[in-house]
């Protein structure tokens, strides 16, 4: 599938990845899109002085080959024009 189709899939809750990615086990998910009632004590938000209710806006996060989550993933030009995107449903 192309990136437009992959984007629609991830917006619907699937995890997406490219067949051609070298790092096996990598994938992208949609994260955020929810309201937090209060910052967790000790979190980066709390240390920045963010208090009260706030919204985490929807964004894309990458699980990289090392198993780390990288928030705010942005596709490369190659990713945008690739035709090797795949999607898998995730558990609810």
Task: Name what the model sees in each region.
Residues 57-92:
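Short, compact, well-ordered microdomains
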């Amino acid at each position: 599938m192309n990136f437009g189709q992959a984007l629609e899939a991830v917006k619907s809750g699937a995890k997406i990845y490219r067949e051609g990615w070298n790092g096996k086990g990598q994938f992208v998910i949609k994260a955020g899109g929810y309201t937090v009632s209060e910052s967790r004590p000790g979190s980066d938000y709390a240390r920045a002085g963010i208090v009260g209710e706030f919204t985490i806006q929807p964004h894309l996060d990458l699980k990289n080959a090392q198993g780390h989550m990288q928030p705010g993933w942005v596709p490369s030009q190659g990713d945008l024009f690739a035709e090797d995107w795949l999607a898998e449903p995730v558990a609810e």
